[in-house]
């Protein structure tokens, strides 16, 4: 069975909490998941090993990608995402002008490289709570189904 690559960047733990919930949903659907923090990926060629990719990020400053994702996104220029099912999630703060702008940047990069975004991106204010937790678990379940990785 094909595995799903789950990659995320976190600073305060909010995006990691989101990744935990998404992974829970994926596992409930019996999908196999390989999970990495963006800063631990030395080579974007890792993406070529997967047909299904979920990426999550927090937003830094005025809607920017965090440093942990900059090199990875730059290296994605060399990767063909055609035929890959993808989804994006992230945390942010509405106090800033561009709420979760880094999520939009990642989604645009995946589309530019030919990836198929199969679910609307999930954007959460700070740490997921209450109904947001169930939304993220469902996001994982839905991605597993849309990618054909659910059992």
Curated annotation (Swiss-Prot):
Residue stretches in coiled coil:
none
> Which of this chain's residues are annotated to bind FMN?
10-14, 88-119
| Function in brief | Low-potential electron donor to a number of redox enzymes.
One GO molecular function term of this record is: electron transfer activity
Q: Does Transcription regulation count among this protein's keywords?
A: no
Supply the InterPro entries for this chain: Flav_short (IPR010087), Flavdoxin-like (IPR001094), Flavodoxin (IPR050619), Flavodoxin/NO_synth (IPR008254), Flavodoxin_CS (IPR001226), Flavoprotein-like_sf (IPR029039)
Start and end residues of each Flavodoxin-like domain: 4-144
Q: Give the source's domain of life in one word.
A: Bacteria
The cofactors named for this UniProt entry are: FMN
Which keywords belong to this entry?
Electron transport, Flavoprotein, FMN, Transport
- Which PROSITE patterns is this protein grouped with? FLAVODOXIN, FLAVODOXIN_LIKE
Which species does the entry assign this protein to? Bacillus subtilis (strain 168)
Which family does the record claim for this protein? Belongs to the flavodoxin family.
Task: Supply the gene name.
Answer: ykuP
Name of the protein this chain belongs to? Probable flavodoxin 2
The record, for PANTHER family, names: FLAVODOXIN 1, FLAVODOXIN 2
Q: Do you know which SUPFAM superfamilies this protein is assigned to?
A: Flavoproteins
């Amino acid at each position: 069975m094909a595995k799903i690559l789950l990659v995320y960047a976190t600073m305060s733990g909010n995006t990691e909490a989101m990744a935990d919930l998404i992974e829970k949903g994926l596992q409930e659907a019996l999908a196999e998941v390989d999970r990495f923090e963006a800063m631990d990926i030395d080579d974007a060629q890792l993406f070529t090993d997967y047909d299904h990719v979920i990426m999550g990020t927090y937003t830094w400053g005025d809607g920017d990608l965090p440093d942990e994702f900059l090199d990875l996104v730059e290296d994605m220029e060399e990767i063909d995402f055609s035929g890959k099912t993808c989804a994006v999630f992230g945390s942010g703060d509405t106090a800033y002008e561009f709420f979760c702008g880094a999520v939009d940047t990642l989604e645009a990069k995946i589309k530019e490289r030919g990836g198929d975004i199969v679910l609307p991106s999930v954007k959460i204010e700070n740490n997921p709570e209450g109904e947001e937790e169930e939304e993220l678990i469902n996001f994982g379940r839905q991605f597993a189904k849309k990618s054909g990785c659910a059992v």
